[in-house]
């Protein structure tokens, strides 16, 4: 391990055990973000146009290299610097030097991110500001590089808000002003609870917490239910259905908020209670320490409420088995290596839904098992090949989420489909790295021509032709061209237009330009080779018209058939770049011999690439996302150290010789002057010398840069195979079940000059106006002497940090798509029957079956999307081994019945492995199985729903699929545009603007191009003709087999909790059916359902029961009584009827009025079953704030969701002698068909006769007060009712608990810290072997 004496000795002399100052950020409150601000860093240290002489360049030190050749610079980085404000760039100064009368502008560059953090780290170390454990770990280590967390998407808080809270409605007449006396110490604990649940509370409800579901989400909770406008906007529904859409939208927003709840709880301010100052009751519930913000729980009313009956009830519940309430510290976990606390558990007054998510977050973080080696591998993948790292493993003290390769690659693919400009962001990161590597830079001296070039008319034309193509050296364009070579492509590229007639021999310059471009940039050349063919064909038609005619007769394009044979078109057609992704290839690059076109073939062979495919080995080791099972990158050339001759230079000599012959032949044919041939050859020989000089820089330095960048995290697609004749990029799309898809590579993408519009003339300044460190070292630069310019090894943390920031932004940008995709896809199911085959079978035991109709309409559609092989057909001869092989190969537990009687062993296998058998129908299924199954009966089956995810052996979401199905049943049918609107609405509340580089990413990405219906979306390859291909586990990566809704494991686990929250009856509060009955209501009870009196005749509503007839000289609505057939034109005097209305569709207002009149005048009882409504309980002092009459209910359109208010008159004030007498009775028409006070926790917190319990008063549930336990696997459990038993998981029942154990991090856990390591750069860049072992 390398070390630096200065730092090491200094650190060894530090006092190791002195307590440092505690970072105030460790005790931040709710809303304090643990997401770190990041700076862009010095990503383009050489960006901009700089024309330097070699002498001027030699005076410049590279400030961004951090590691120089064979040395280790002493640079320490501060973890806490990442928490600071975004760094401000230092002032830029300029100096002018006169070298050979050329003005040179040099920039004094601002310090890099690493350099800025160096000072902070050293200062903290010297001033005792580092955690003592951290100091011990880093003693003796020469820290010169930082490694940031690979996945840090948590927000640290110390005072967590719950999802649920108590809301109280008071009746002022009963409120007592005197407060129960409690000691000051007790009051700190019980005060908030006593003050909330005070005497005179009419009702206490459990509601969603406004403080958590803030206004930024757009959730309106004024009616006790979540309502959101403008999320789901159904089109074409009848008026009045908006409320239903708002309600479902509210549930979706609540669910999304829970799914994205990334809070981590850190230990906040705590108190150690002094028992002698507290009452016995309080002492009994407090642990050794407790959080200062105690919160509210009914258990704290014990002995402190003035309501006697309530005190008795709570006391009895807390004393019974199965209810254990506590407050404060429950457990402590230690790092046994360093003997420091890491995790503590605290019993808090918070609902179990929020507590579950908080525990899920911390558990995911602590169980990820990410080591220092994992971070170092990520850093190594962004470092120059052969760089070594040394760093300590800090274990549990620096936890982070595991880098989810599968999830990130799915998000990258979805983001690429949505944002084609993502290509530009990745190119920008790569460009910054090339710039910081200082591998190439321009000089003022231009070497386009030999010094002794002949001075004649032919030479003048040549110079003019070269100058027409060779532009001034633009270093940023050169860096971009290099970076583009290994970057993913999400837009089809095009050649920048070239105007050339090829009438003059000097026009060979354009042909040479193309060859040089193919040599320097073979990947980019392949992307635009079709456009280049158009130019070359014009050249051949002018210079070799006979050969050209032969060539186009064979065809200008070809395809490759299934046998791998080339099939030429036989047409002379101009290439269109839209064909690049098609099955067509430009024929010039077929490398197929053609008799009579030898010159064309000879010239085209000069375009053959000379590089090699390199496996992205470091990216694989770092578990970086890659879209291929065999991730490789084509490197244009390889290092040549140890070879006698440089193959790259030799290749150019071959090119020069070939082109010299071409020009010579052309000159002879056209009887050109000797001077023309002479000056051209002289120029080509000059270029050959130039190429000889720079070849070593490309093969021994730039090749290492390419190999390094090939491992970068965001270079996740294979770039090129090295064969222009056969290569087509893998084309992936995001599919949907309706047959549409969104391609990853846009055929008609944005045209951006330099990014997608390619200028091949960039090769001229690379060849003739640039210098390289290795060229200067060789003495072949303009200095004419050897200058030992140091090789720069760029800081890898800059590009890694930027890549992680982009990945984080893209993951968040795709989250709304993923969320809606899950809602529309999750819970997909098919109806099946389970036929019992044994006498003692339970309902779900037996052989599973469904029909072809079900299979075709549900499963088959999904099979197409997931593109697995077809299941096998089974017959009477099928064996268990054959069935097992099919299930293993297809990953689908489905077989298709074809014929015969299924034998006994096969039947047993189908039963034991829960394979789904697809039958033609259910007719006499017993006859299709062996007689050995004597217990099987055609009528002995259980019909149920089978999750499609279960069929596919991908049971990621089984536990919540029922809840998803319930939610989907409430949603209106949505078009693609409506789904897109919902996604964009959710995106407005998605926090993606987290880092400095993230902000740049957002600005650059531009407008979203989202045209796909996100439902059952999957990632699939397509053929060049657009045919969607089945998933192929020999080609496609495992991450593409199943999209997992584009959500990661942590999001799915939170989502599971959120679904249980919104489907909990006490929160959902959606009801069906009301009873219309005319009764007095002097003492209103919201849950009262009046009984149907005896003797009433049950009648099902039908339109035919009501007609129009003439009675008393008027047309009247006449009711015909089914039992007797008697007609009753008047609502008065009709028989006692209990009418049930299952479907109101088509009911006229006249009939509705007539039925209501019958309720009032003939005491009918009418049950309306198809009405849906949310309910709100009102108190006497509130009164009704809105009114819905019975007629509106009966005539409302289908889909309308009512909001009904019901009065709770239990605490209606007694009238005084001075109140005027009532003039009549209170009458009521509308009653619920089931209790609607599901949200209620307590009712009537008053004493009757100062002591007794009022009739109908309700105490809180014991479940609300039961702290229970936190199991080893992270589940919150209720207390067991008996010793030796295990408590019920709180999430599996509909009860709500407001006392739960929450795991918290101590200050010893530093999730937001970078990890400092020692980086050892290679001794010699030319000794690096870039070929894989």
UniProtKB/Swiss-Prot annotation:
Q: Which Pfam families match?
A: VP1-like_C, VP1_protrusion
**GO CC annotations on file:** T=2 icosahedral viral capsid; viral inner capsid
Where it mainly occurs, coarsely classed, is: virion
Disordered as annotated region, ranges: 1-71
Recorded hits in InterPro entries, A to Z, give: VP1/VP3_C, VP1_protrusion
> Keywords of this protein's UniProt record, alphabetized?
Capsid protein, Inner capsid protein, T=2 icosahedral capsid protein, Virion
Q: Give the compositionally biased regions (Basic and acidic residues).
A: 11-21
Q: Polar residues bias: where?
A: 22-42
Q: Where in or outside the cell is it found?
A: Virion
Here the segments flagged for biased composition (Low complexity) are 1-10
Family per similarity comment: Belongs to the turreted BTV-fold inner capsid family.
Instruction: Report quaternary structure and partners.
Output: Homodecamer; each decamer is made up of two conformers of VP2, called VP2A and VP2B. 12 homodecamers assemble to form an icosahedral capsid.
Q: What does this protein do?
A: Inner capsid protein that self-assembles to form an icosahedral capsid with a T=2 symmetry, which consists of 120 copies of VP2, with channels at each of its five-fold vertices. This capsid constitutes the innermost concentric layer of the viral mature particle.
What is the protein's given name? Inner capsid protein VP1
Q: Which organism is it from?
A: Bombyx mori cytoplasmic polyhedrosis virus
Taxonomically, what lineage is the organism?
A: Viruses, Riboviria, Orthornavirae, Duplornaviricota, Resentoviricetes
């Amino acid at each position: 391990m390398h070390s630096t004496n200065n730092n090491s000795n200094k650190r060894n002399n530090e006092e190791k055990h002195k307590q440092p100052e505690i970072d105030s950020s460790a005790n931040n409150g709710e809303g304090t973000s643990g997401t770190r601000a990041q700076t862009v860093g010095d990503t383009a240290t050489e960006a901009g146009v700089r024309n330097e002489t070699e002498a001027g360049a030699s005076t410049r030190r590279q400030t961004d290299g951090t590691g120089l050749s064979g040395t280790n610079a002493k640079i320490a980085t501060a973890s806490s610097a990442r928490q600071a404000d975004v760094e401000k760039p230092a002032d830029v100064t300029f100096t002018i030097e006169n070298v050979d009368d050329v003005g040179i502008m040099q920039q004094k560059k601002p310090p890099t991110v690493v350099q800025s953090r160096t000072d902070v780290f050293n200062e903290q170390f010297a001033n005792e500001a580092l955690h003592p454990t951290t100091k011990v770990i880093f003693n003796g280590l020469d820290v010169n590089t930082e490694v940031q967390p690979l996945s840090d998407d948590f927000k640290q808080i110390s005072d967590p808000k719950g999802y649920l809270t108590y809301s109280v409605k008071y009746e002022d007449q009963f409120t007592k002003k005197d407060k129960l006396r409690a000691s000051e110490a007790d009051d700190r604990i019980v005060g908030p609870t006593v003050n909330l649940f005070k005497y005179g509370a009419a009702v206490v409800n459990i509601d969603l917490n406004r403080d958590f579901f803030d206004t930024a989400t757009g959730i309106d909770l004024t009616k006790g239910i979540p309502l959101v406008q403008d999320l789901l906007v159904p089109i074409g529904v009848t008026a009045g259905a908006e409320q239903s859409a708002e309600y479902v939208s509210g549930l979706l927003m609540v669910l999304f908020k829970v799914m994205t709840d990334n809070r981590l709880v850190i230990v906040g301010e705590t108190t150690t209670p002094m028992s002698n100052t507290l009452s016995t009751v309080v002492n009994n519930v407090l642990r050794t320490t407790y959080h200062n913000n105690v919160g509210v729980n009914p258990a704290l009313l014990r002995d402190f409420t003035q309501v006697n009956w309530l005190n008795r009830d709570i006391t009895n519940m807390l004393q019974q088995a199965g209810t254990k309430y506590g407050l404060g510290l429950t457990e402590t976990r230690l790092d046994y290596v360093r003997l420091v606390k890491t995790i503590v558990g605290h019993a808090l007054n918070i609902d179990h839904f929020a507590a579950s998510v908080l525990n899920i977050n911390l558990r995911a973080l602590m169980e990820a098992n990410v080591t220092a080696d994992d971070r170092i591998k990520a850093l190594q993948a962004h470092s120059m090949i052969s760089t070594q790292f040394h760093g300590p493993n800090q274990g549990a003290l620096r936890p982070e989420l595991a880098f989810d390769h599968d999830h990130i690659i799915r998000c990258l693919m979805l983001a690429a489909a949505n944002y084609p400009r993502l290509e530009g962001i990745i190119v920008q990161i790569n460009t910054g790295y090339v710039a910081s590597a200082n591998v190439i830079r321009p000089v003022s001296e231009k070497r386009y021509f030999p010094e002794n070039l002949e001075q004649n008319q032919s030479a003048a034309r040549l110079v003019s032709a070269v100058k027409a193509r060779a532009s001034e050296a633009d270093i940023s364009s050169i860096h971009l061209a290099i970076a583009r070579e290994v970057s993913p492509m999400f837009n089809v590229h095009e050649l920048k237009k070239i105007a050339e007639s090829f009438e003059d021999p000097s026009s060979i310059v354009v042909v040479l330009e193309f060859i040089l471009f193919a040599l320097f940039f073979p990947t980019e050349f392949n992307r635009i080779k079709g456009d280049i063919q158009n130019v070359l064909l014009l050249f051949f038609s002018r210079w070799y018209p006979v050969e050209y005619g032969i060539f186009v007769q064979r065809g200008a394009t070809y395809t490759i058939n299934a046998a791998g044979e080339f099939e030429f078109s036989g047409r002379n057609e101009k290439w269109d770049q839209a064909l690049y992704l098609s099955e067509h290839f430009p024929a010039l690059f077929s490398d197929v011999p053609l008799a009579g076109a030898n010159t064309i073939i000879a010239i085209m062979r000069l375009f053959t690439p000379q590089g090699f495919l390199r496996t992205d080995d470091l990216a694989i080791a770092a578990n970086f996302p890659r879209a291929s099972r065999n991730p490789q990158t084509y490197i244009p050339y390889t290092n040549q150290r140890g070879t006698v001759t440089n193959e790259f230079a030799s290749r150019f000599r071959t090119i020069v010789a070939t082109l010299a012959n071409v020009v010579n032949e052309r000159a002879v044919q056209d009887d050109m002057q000797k001077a023309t041939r002479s000056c051209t050859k002289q120029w080509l020989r000059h270029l050959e010398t130039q190429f000889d000089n720079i070849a070593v820089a490309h093969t021994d330095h730039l090749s290492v840069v390419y190999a390094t960048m090939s491992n970068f995290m965001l270079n996740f697609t294979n770039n090129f195979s090295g064969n222009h004749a056969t290569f087509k990029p893998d084309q992936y799309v995001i599919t949907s079940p309706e047959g549409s898809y969104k391609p990853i590579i846009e055929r008609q993408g944005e045209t951006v000059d330099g990014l997608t519009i390619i200028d091949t003339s960039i090769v001229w300044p690379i060849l003739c106006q640039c210098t390289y460190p290795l060229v200067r070292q060789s003495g072949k630069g303009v200095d004419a002497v050897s200058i030992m310019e140091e090789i720069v090894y760029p800081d890898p943390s800059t590009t890694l940090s930027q890549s992680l920031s982009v990945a984080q932004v893209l993951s968040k940008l795709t989250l709304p798509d993923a969320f809606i995709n899950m809602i529309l896809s999750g819970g997909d199911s098919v109806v099946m029957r389970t036929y019992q085959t044994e006498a003692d079978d339970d309902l779900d035991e037996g052989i599973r079956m469904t029909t072809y109709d079900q299979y075709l309409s549900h499963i088959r559609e999904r099979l197409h999307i997931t593109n697995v092989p077809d299941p096998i057909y089974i017959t009477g001869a099928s064996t268990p081994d054959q069935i097992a092989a099919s299930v293993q190969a297809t990953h689908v537990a489905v077989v298709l019945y074809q014929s015969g009687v299924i034998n006994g062993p096969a039947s047993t296998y189908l039963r034991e492995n829960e394979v789904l058998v697809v039958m033609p129908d259910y007719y006499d299924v017993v006859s299709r199985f062996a007689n050995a199954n004597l217990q099987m009966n055609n009528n002995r089956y259980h019909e149920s729903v089978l999750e499609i995810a279960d069929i596919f052996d991908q049971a990621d979401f089984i536990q919540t699929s029922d809840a998803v199905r319930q939610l989907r049943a409430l949603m209106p049918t949505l078009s693609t545009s409506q789904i897109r609107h919902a996604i964009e609405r959710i995106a407005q509340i998605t926090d993606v603007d987290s880092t400095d580089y993230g902000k740049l990413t957002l600005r650059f990405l531009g407008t979203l191009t989202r045209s796909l219906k996100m439902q059952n979306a999957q990632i699939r390859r397509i053929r060049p003709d657009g045919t969607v291909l089945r998933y192929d586990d020999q080609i496609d990566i495992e991450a593409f087999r199943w999209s997992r809704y584009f959500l990661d494991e942590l999001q799915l686990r939170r989502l599971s909790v959120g679904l249980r929250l919104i489907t909990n009856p006490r929160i959902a509060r959606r009801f069906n059916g009301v009873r219309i009955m005319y009764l007095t209501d002097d003492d209103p009870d919201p849950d009262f359902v009046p009984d149907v009196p005896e003797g009433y005749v049950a009648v099902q509503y039908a339109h035919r029961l009501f007609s129009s007839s003439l009675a008393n000289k008027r047309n009247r609505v006449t009711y015909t009584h089914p039992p007797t057939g008697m007609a009753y034109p008047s609502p008065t005097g009709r028989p006692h009827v209990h009418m049930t209305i299952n479907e109101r569709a088509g009911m006229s207002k006249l009939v509705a009025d007539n039925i209501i009149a019958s309720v009032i005048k003939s005491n009918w009882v009418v049950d309306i079953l198809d009405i849906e409504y949310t309910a709100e309980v009102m108190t006497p002092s509130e009164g009704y704030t809105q009114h819905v009459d019975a007629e509106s209910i009966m005539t409302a359109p289908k889909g309308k969701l009512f909001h009904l208010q019901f009065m709770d008159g239990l605490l209606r004030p007694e009238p005084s002698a001075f109140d005027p007498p009532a003039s009549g009775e209170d009458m009521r028409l509308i009653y619920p068909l089931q209790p609607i006070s599901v949200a209620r926790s307590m009712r009537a917190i008053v004493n009757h006769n100062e002591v007794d319990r009022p009739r109908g008063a309700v105490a809180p549930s014991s479940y609300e007060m039961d702290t229970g336990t936190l199991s080893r696997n992270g589940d919150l459990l209720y207390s067991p009712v008996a010793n030796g038993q295990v408590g019920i998981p709180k999430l599996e029942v509909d009860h709500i608990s407001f006392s739960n154990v929450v795991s918290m991090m101590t200050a010893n856990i530093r999730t937001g810290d970078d990890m400092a390591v020692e980086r050892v750069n290679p001794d010699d860049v030319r000794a690096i072997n870039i070929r894989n072992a």
